[in-house]
Amino acid sequence: DYVTDEGVQIYGGMGFSADAPMDRSYRDARINRIFEGTNEINRLLTVDQLLKRAMSGKIDIMSAAMAVQKELMSVPDFGAGEDEGVLTNELKAVRNIKKAILLVAGAAVQKLMNKLKHEQEILMNIADMIIDLYAAESSVLRLQKKIDTVGEEAADLEIQIVKTFISDAVERVNINGKHALQSFAEGDELRMMLMGLKRYTKLDPFNTKNARRAIATKISEDQGYKF
């Protein structure tokens, strides 16, 4: 949808015309926008269903959330000695995103209890964190399988795609987590949790500009997205 909107802008007034190449893409993009209403409902239901199962004892979220809170009181693990290949940083990021979600969701449940279901903004923040986790973990695991099959060199561009996505996802998780925490916590409690969130959304620097240029060049050469 973003690419379509940018394409329409590039062609200016002609962007909506059948004489320009963007008209079909713009019509197709309308389908996604119709789905957006349903997606908004599903975002709310994602967290709602998760919390209902936790409250009924079907899944144990609070124990994991309490473990994360306990970890915050310990000395940070800087990952010394960890080596999981080219995706070491990304695999660690996925694990930390899970902890960030548990930190925010656990604190929200403890603080708001049954009132949480009425706090749609907080539910949306947590849902967006979960969505980014799902996409991040899925992309990393899928890339791992490809690397095991064809090797790192053959999967170089896919590696850059995943690293770029993870970099963006971690930033979004940090922002959503921060907005959620600031909605129900304050004072020293808020400062402590924000420090914890920062700890779990820390990522080694990666040059996303060069990666995006390499990705764009490949797409331009192939005249399509062939990954």
Regions found by a protein language model. Name each.
Residues 1-227:
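Flavin-dependent oxidoreductase catalytic core characteristic
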